[in-house]
């Protein structure tokens, strides 16, 4: 699948789900967004970029942390997500937030624009995630930092599902899955550099990052 076709599908999927995103069923992205903000520790006055901001799982907690002296910029490829986030920002009376439709793979900001770049379950959707990570390093100021979350990718299991669930999926369903959606293909397609901790460290160091820290959280 070509990157342009894939991105159109991603945009359409998130656009169509924007009105109910993380509002039906069990909450997931909202608590995980708060968790990411807690880990990344934005402080008063900082400039924050939230990539793939969705409806604001990270955006709003970060805005509270940086206060009126700071600012949080949210970007998302799906216009529907930006519209929903903008509505909520207005309802909350937040003036330290800006939102725009933008492809997170090629952020259009000058060098050293931000103190913190965050991405909650968004980096994994970028066809050239490693290239994007390198570009984020360029728009971070000296001493800036990046924080992002991802499901655990393991060969033979499905992303976003605990490994224990894989044996519960009917074999008949697995046999009829398109090749590109089988576990091994998903791991290859969605960033094999996330499969092992050492791969992640090596990738981030190659993009110019240092003093790396990892943590694992379970939701639910």
UniProtKB/Swiss-Prot annotation:
It comes from the Bacteria. The keyword Repeat does not apply. It holds the Pfam family Methyltransf_25. Pathway: Antibiotic biosynthesis; daunorubicin biosynthesis; Antibiotic biosynthesis; carminomycin biosynthesis; Antibiotic biosynthesis; rhodomycin biosynthesis; Antibiotic biosynthesis; aclacinomycin biosynthesis. Its EC number is 2.1.1.288. Coiled coil: none annotated. GO terms for molecular function: methyltransferase activity. Keywords: Antibiotic biosynthesis, Methyltransferase, S-adenosyl-L-methionine, Transferase. Involved in the biosynthesis of aklavinone which is an important precursor common to the formation of the clinically significant anthracyclines such as carminomycin, daunorubicin (daunomycin), rhodomycin, aclacinomycin T (aklavin) and aclacinomycin A (aclarubicin). These compounds are aromatic polyketide antibiotics that exhibit high cytotoxicity and are widely applied in the chemotherapy of a variety of cancers. Catalyzes the methyl esterification of aklanonic acid to yield aklanonic acid methyl ester. Belongs to the methyltransferase superfamily. DnrC family. This is Aklanonic acid methyltransferase DauC. The gene is dauC.
């Amino acid at each position: 699948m070509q990157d342009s076709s894939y991105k159109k599908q991603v945009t359409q999927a998130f656009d169509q789900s924007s009105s109910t995103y993380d509002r039906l069923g069990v909450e997931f992205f909202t608590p995980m967004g708060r968790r990411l903000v807690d880990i990344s520790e934005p402080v008063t006055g900082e400039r924050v970029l939230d990539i793939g901001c969705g409806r604001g799982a990270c955006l709003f907690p970060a805005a509270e942390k940086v206060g009126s002296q700071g600012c949080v910029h949210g970007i998302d490829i799906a216009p529907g997500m930006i519209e929903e986030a903008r509505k909520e920002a207005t309802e909350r009376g937040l003036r330290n937030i800006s939102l725009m439709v933008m492809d997170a793979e090629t952020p259009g900001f000058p060098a050293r624009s931000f103190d913190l770049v965050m991405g909650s379950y968004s980096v994994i959707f970028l066809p050239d995630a490693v290239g994007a990570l390198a570009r984020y390093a360029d728009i971070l100021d000296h001493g800036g930092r990046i924080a992002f979350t991802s499901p655990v990718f393991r060969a033979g299991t499905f992303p976003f599902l605990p490994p224990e669930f894989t044996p519960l999926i009917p074999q008949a369903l697995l046999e009829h899955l398109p090749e590109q959606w089988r576990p091994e293909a998903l791991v290859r397609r969605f960033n094999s550099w996330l499969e092992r901790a050492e791969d992640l460290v090596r990738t981030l160091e190659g993009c110019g990052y240092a003093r790396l820290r990892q943590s694992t959280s379970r939701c639910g």
